């Protein structure tokens, strides 16, 4: 029966009873045959039998008596096949009745063994019983043995002879089944609860585990004996297909081989039982049947895996679910889709921000059904068939229709790897010739694409809703800001930068300097007549600018001094935006009075005294974009970006920028600098030979000498560059390359690292212009090779980190506006020693204040409680000298399965308050994972300084923190608040003892002798402070302090890693991840509740479980917070679907089945898996309940020539418009 995916609320998993398996089945599979090799028809009673599984051809029985849909539902009287759609062969199951019970390997073999826990037996004993090595006592009767005792064949025979009928023992799965059926779960649970009150140590741990499993059986209505199977389900044949290859051979799914082994052994066992064969033969056959079923369910879990042809292990049912190629990750979480294509991308400078160039052949294929509909509607084709023929012939009519079909039908472009949400954006297609898709040059940054052969995939959203969503939420013009830090991600690069840089450069003494023009037009005419140059400094009557330009009245009466290029640059800015004359933030408030002269004043005198203003570099252009976005939002910004792109391309072409060998200037002082360095090295070597210094000191001094020499050359080289040198312009403007590239071209390459990462003390003194010697070339190759392998490793590591992060945070969604949390987090600037890692401004911007903030000097209120701190407020707070602000934080959010708007604050990608329904968890994971590839893989070695531990940095450090591992070289932390009373060194044992006296007790800590102390004798120390230098183990910190301290420490540490590499990631993303690591508590004392000691549970579930006890005045349970690494946290989620599709699939499913777990489908992943609309954005329950109706008639819109890019409306507004 078909289930409407969007209707059901939750999904439950459990153990299947034999009757349940029979009820699923459409018939028993009795023979191992598959397909008759001559007729290619399925064999009767075989694994592909049409009577059991349905017809192989649509609406046609096996013998051909009934054909056509009109006989639907009839069962043929000749061949017994039901006439129906052949699709049922994907859903109808069969079964095999086993001649002897067989244990399910998941429940016997898993860790811990579930059968072992229920029976209180060791896995070793179970194995001996199941595989017929020992007997087990089922009923001792009068015999002097215990129940569940193991015995040999000989002991069994003697006891059987002596005690006869009352004594009962057995072996194999049958014995296990009897034992499981005889367990009284309720009595066992009571007994264990009593035991728990006395037990300690290992005994207690075992009791807790057993109680957990037994309670699970009691609460789930699963019977323990169902872990042993009498019947095996046979999955539908189309899920284990058999196809004929050329040459008459067959390719088949491994499952068919595994099923055939089971059926063969089962049939043989039946025959042996009918023949009353000797016990030892039957036993052997039962053991083989058990092994065959084990291999079918999980091949290779026990013993050697069953291999197929070529000694390849066969893929069992478990393998079908596991891993990247398993059912979950290959077919449920990501599917191949139709209406998609892929092609090489090329640059499309002629495109608007919201357009992409679609090659005509691709467009015809992608929009085929739409074209066919349009052709028939316009009566250009008589029917669908003739329309199809026209398309195949590429008729002219098709091309005419194509233009209209693709108009306003957005398409999605994706580039792998999709590291963050900007890896998929929507565009309006524009038809282009050729076979390459054209991409707008400004979106390349977000996609991390270049045009050296990159390919991209294109997808066509089909339904109206999908098109609306693509247009409103995904259009590229709306994605100006990066979600990780809220800075513009679409900034001009390369040619566009150099063009605008060249245009806005000023040069003293250019032709026409000091001319005064009455208007911009007049200046342009002068330029066209070659009277002035772009770089010429000129005057212009300020009154000639439009009224909207923000000049003061005084400025309007004067002459403004600027350059011709800047006049042209300012024309692309919005009309009421301040005139930009210098690359500074202050210019955004309004142009400075220093650039104006009185009408009668001599402009030449002014210019003689005034220095040349620098050109607009890449960073400043980015600032302009951010400022325009802040003031005018999306539409105006995307139009500005296009204008800036066009201007940049045009002027970089005009500039005629070239690079030649002569631009790489030689440094005349270089030989002298090198000579000096060689002399210093010789001196150091002499000192070493005389034994004045050690080898490591010599090595260190030599490397220092060469580093210094390279720095001197670098400084002199920069000073010697002409400002008009094209190479210098490229670097200075930020278009391409940095200073070290040019030092290597014209200065010296310097010291290189060897294969082990150690610096080779022979420097590469040559540069690329002179050319390297063979020796130098080989020294250089080490670094190049290491760089390549590092990058490859880094990409894999970073991708896996992102996957784990997404998995742990995927159900964090903004669920409400305010949860009335009663505490916030006090934040101050993050420091590393004396340097600021992240300033207070960055930490409070776009967050909500927990309590009002007042200016300490004047007493003025700067921001109220629950009010957002915007740029102006943040600046005011910093200016007022306030160092600490209490803000609403994700850490203190009380919203279940998510956060509230006030906790999260501003959505960095839009610059607006975040909306209910935003999937902030996934965005957070992407924001932390995406820059992962830029982090280093290396651990820095502190050049042989004694006591300096190697510090883990970069990607390994981030992993160490989020996996909550014990860090390398960790520091000891104080467990008490008090004073350091003594530090005693013990050189013999290479340790030192630090004694701290607290208010109530005194603690002594033993540290390595080389440890660098953070406290001296007599210093005060707080609990949780690190005593010596080094990273703290967050689990230890949590045990000594509270959750908030631990969370803040982890946040600070992660920020240090990213900011050190110059990567800005907003605090809130890291907060989301860390909160997910701390959402569980472990029950310490169950009090008078139904909880079990040692249980891991969500904080919200724990509070709910405690409510009845508190209500009835009973003793509530107590628990302590637990810090889980992200992998563990992702596996401990309440959704078994999400956990199973992440890692350890069989373990997760085994556990979920025994507990009869119910998946409430609150996260994104579980809904994707079952194909339900995800509960984020418009898929949230409150948006889904909205009904829509059309009021009045729909009026056709008049056609507009070139409409600007639409503003991106909010989700709430979209929902409201549906509502209305």
From Swiss-Prot:
Query: Main role?
Result: DNA-dependent RNA polymerase catalyzes the transcription of DNA into RNA using the four ribonucleoside triphosphates as substrates.
A Gene Ontology molecular function term of the record = DNA binding
Entry-linked CDD domains:
RNAP_beta'_C, RNAP_beta'_N
Q: Which Gene3D superfamilies match?
A: 1.10.132.30, 1.10.150.390, 1.10.1790.20, 1.10.40.90, 2.40.40.20, 2.40.50.100, RNA polymerase II, clamp domain, RNA polymerase Rpb1, domain 3
**InterPro entries for the chain:** DNA-dir_RpoC_beta_prime, DNA-dir_RpoC_beta_prime_bact, RNA_pol_asu, RNA_pol_N, RNA_pol_Rpb1_1, RNA_pol_Rpb1_3, RNA_pol_Rpb1_3_sf, RNA_pol_Rpb1_4
User: What cofactor is needed?
Assistant: Mg(2+); Zn(2+)
Residues covered by region (Disordered): 1197-1220
Question: Per the similarity annotation, which family is this?
Answer: Belongs to the RNA polymerase beta' chain family.
Q: Where is the composition biased (Basic and acidic residues)?
A: 1209-1220
EC nos: 2.7.7.6
**Protein source organism:** Leuconostoc citreum (strain KM20)
At which positions is Mg(2+) bound? 450, 452, 454
Q: What is this protein called?
A: DNA-directed RNA polymerase subunit beta'
């Amino acid at each position: 029966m078909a289930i409407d995916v969007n209707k059901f609320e939750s999904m439950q998993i459990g153990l299947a009873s034999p009757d349940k398996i029979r009820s699923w089945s459409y018939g028993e599979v009795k023979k191992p045959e598959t397909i008759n090799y001559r007729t290619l028809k399925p064999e009767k009673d075989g694994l592909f039998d049409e009577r059991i599984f349905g017809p192989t051809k649509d609406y046609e029985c096996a013998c051909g008596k009934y054909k056509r849909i009109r006989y639907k539902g009839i069962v043929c009287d000749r061949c017994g096949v039901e006439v129906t759609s052949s699709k049922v062969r994907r859903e109808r199951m069969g079964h095999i009745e086993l001649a002897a019970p067989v244990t399910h390997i998941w429940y016997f073999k898993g860790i811990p063994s579930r059968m072992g826990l229920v029976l209180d037996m060791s896995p070793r004993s179970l194995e001996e019983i199941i595989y017929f090595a020992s007997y087990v006592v089922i009923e001792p009767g009068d015999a002097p043995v215990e129940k569940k005792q193991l015995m040999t064949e000989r002991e069994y025979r003697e006891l059987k002879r002596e005690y006869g009928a009352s004594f009962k023992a057995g072996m194999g799965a049958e014995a296990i089944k009897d034992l499981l059926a005889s367990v009284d779960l309720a009595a066992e649970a009571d007994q264990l609860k009593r035991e728990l009150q006395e037990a300690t140590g290992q005994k207690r741990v075992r009791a807790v585990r057993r109680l957990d499993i037994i309670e699970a059986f009691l609460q789930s209505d699963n019977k323990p004996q169902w872990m042993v199977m009498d019947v095996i389900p046979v999955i539908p044949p189309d899920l284990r297909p058999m196809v004929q290859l050329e040459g008459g051979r067959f390719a088949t799914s491994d499952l068919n081989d595994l099923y055939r082994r089971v059926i063969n052994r089962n049939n043989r066992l039946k025959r042996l039982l009918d023949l009353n064969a000797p016990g030892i033969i039957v036993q052997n056959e039962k053991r083989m049947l058990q092994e065959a079923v084990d291999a079918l369910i999980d091949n290779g879990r026990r013993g050697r895996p069953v291999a197929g042809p070529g000694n390849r292990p066969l893929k069992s049912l478990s393998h079908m679910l596991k891993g990247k190629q398993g059912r979950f990750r290959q077919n449920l979480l990501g599917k191949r889709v139709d209406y998609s294509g892929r092609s090489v991308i090329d640059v499309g400078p002629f495109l608007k921000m919201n357009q992409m160039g679609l090659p005509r052949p691709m467009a015809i294929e992608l929009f085929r059904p739409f074209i066919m509909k349009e052709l028939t509607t316009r009566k250009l084709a008589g029917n669908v068939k003739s329309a199809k023929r026209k398309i195949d012939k590429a008729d002219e009519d098709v091309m005419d229709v194509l233009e209209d079909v693709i108009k306003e039908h957005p398409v999605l472009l994706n580039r792998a790897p999709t590291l963050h949400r900007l890896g998929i954006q929507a565009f309006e297609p524009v038809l282009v010739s050729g076979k390459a898709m054209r991409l707008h040059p400004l979106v390349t940054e977000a996609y991390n694409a270049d045009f050296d052969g990159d390919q991209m995939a294109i997808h066509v959203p089909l339904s109206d809703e999908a098109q609306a969503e693509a247009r409103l939420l995904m259009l590229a013009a709306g994605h100006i800001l990066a979600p990780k830090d809220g800075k513009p991600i679409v900034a001009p690069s390369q040619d566009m930068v150099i063009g605008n840089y060249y245009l806005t450069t000023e040069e003293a003494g250019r032709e026409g300097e000091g001319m005064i023009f009455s208007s911009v037009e007049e200046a342009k005419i002068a330029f066209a007549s070659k009277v002035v140059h772009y770089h010429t400094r000129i005057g212009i009557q300020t009154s000639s600018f439009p009224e909207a330009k923000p000049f003061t009245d005084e400025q309007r009466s004067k002459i403004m001094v600027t350059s011709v290029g800047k006049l042209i640059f300012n024309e692309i800015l919005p009309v009421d935006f301040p005139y930009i004359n210098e690359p500074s933030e202050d210019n955004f408030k309004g142009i400075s009075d220093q650039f104006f002269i009185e009408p009668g004043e001599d402009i030449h005198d002014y210019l003689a005294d005034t220095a040349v203003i620098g050109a607009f570099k890449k960073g400043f252009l980015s600032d302009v974009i951010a400022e325009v976005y802040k003031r005018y939002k999306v539409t105006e910004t995307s139009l500005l970006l296009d204008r800036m792109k066009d201007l940049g391309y045009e002027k970089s072409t005009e500039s005629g920028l070239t690079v030649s060998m002569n631009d790489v200037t030689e440094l005349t002082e270089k030989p002298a600098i090198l000579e000096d360095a060689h002399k210093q090295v010789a001196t150091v070597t002499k000192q070493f030979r005389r034994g004045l210094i050690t080898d490591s000191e010599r090595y260190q001094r030599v490397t220092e000498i060469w580093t210094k020499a390279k720095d001197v050359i670098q400084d002199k080289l920069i000073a010697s560059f002409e400002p008009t040198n094209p190479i210098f312009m490229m670097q200075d403007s930020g278009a391409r390359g940095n200073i070290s590239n040019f030092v290597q071209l014209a200065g010296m390459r310097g010291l290189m690292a060897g294969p082990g990462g150690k610096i080779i003390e022979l420097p590469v003194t040559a540069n690329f212009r002179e050319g390297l010697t063979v020796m130098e070339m080989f020294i250089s190759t080490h670094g190049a090779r290491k760089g390549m392998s590092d990058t490859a490793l880094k990409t894999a590591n970073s991708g896996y980190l992102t996957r784990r992060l997404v998995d742990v945070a995927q159900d964090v969604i903004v669920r409400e506006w305010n949860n009335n949390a009663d505490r916030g987090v006090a934040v101050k600037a993050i420091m590393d020693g004396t340097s600021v890692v992240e300033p207070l401004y960055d930490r409070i911007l776009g967050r909500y204040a927990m309590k009002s903030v007042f200016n300490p000097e004047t007493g003025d209120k700067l921001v109220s409680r629950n009010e957002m701190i915007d740029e102006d407020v943040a600046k005011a707070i910093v200016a007022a000298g306030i160092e600490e602000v209490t803000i609403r934080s994700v850490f203190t959010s009380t919203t279940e399965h998510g956060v509230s708007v006030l906790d999260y604050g501003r959505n960095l990608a839009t610059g607006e308050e975040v909306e209910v329904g935003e999937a902030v968890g996934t965005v957070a994971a992407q924001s932390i994972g995406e820059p992962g590839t830029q982090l280093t893989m290396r651990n820095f070695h502190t050049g042989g300084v004694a006591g300096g531990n190697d510090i883990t940095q970069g990607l390994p450090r981030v992993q160490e923190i989020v996996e909550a591992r014990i860090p390398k070289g960790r520091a000891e932390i104080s467990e008490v608040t008090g004073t350091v009373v003594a530090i005693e060194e013990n050189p013999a044992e290479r340790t030192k003892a630090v004694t701290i006296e607290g208010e109530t007790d005194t603690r002594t800590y033993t540290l390595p002798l080389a440890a660098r102390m953070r406290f001296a004798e007599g210093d005060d120390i707080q609990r949780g402070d690190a005593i010596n230098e080094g990273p703290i183990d967050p689990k230890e910190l949590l045990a000594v302090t509270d959750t908030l301290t631990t969370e803040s420490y982890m946040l600070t540490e992660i920020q240090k890693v990213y900011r050190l590499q110059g990567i800005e990631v907003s605090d809130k993303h890291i907060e989301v991840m860390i909160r997910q690591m701390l959402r569980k508590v472990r029950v310490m004392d169950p009090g008078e509740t139904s909880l079990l000691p040692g249980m891991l549970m969500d904080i919200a579930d724990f509070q709910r479980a405690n409510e009845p006890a508190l209500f009835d005045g009973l003793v509530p349970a107590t628990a302590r917070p637990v810090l889980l690494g992200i992998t563990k946290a992702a596996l401990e989620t309440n959704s078994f679907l999400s956990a199973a599709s992440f890692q350890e699939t069989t373990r997760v499913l085994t556990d979920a089945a025994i507990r009869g777990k119910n998946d409430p489908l609150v996260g994104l992943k579980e809904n994707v898996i079952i194909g339900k609309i995800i509960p984020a954005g418009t898929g949230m329950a409150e948006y889904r309940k909205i009904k829509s109706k059309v009021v009045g008639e729909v009026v056709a819109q008049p056609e507009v020539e070139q409409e600007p890019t639409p503003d991106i409306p909010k989700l709430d507004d979209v929902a409201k418009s549906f509502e209305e």
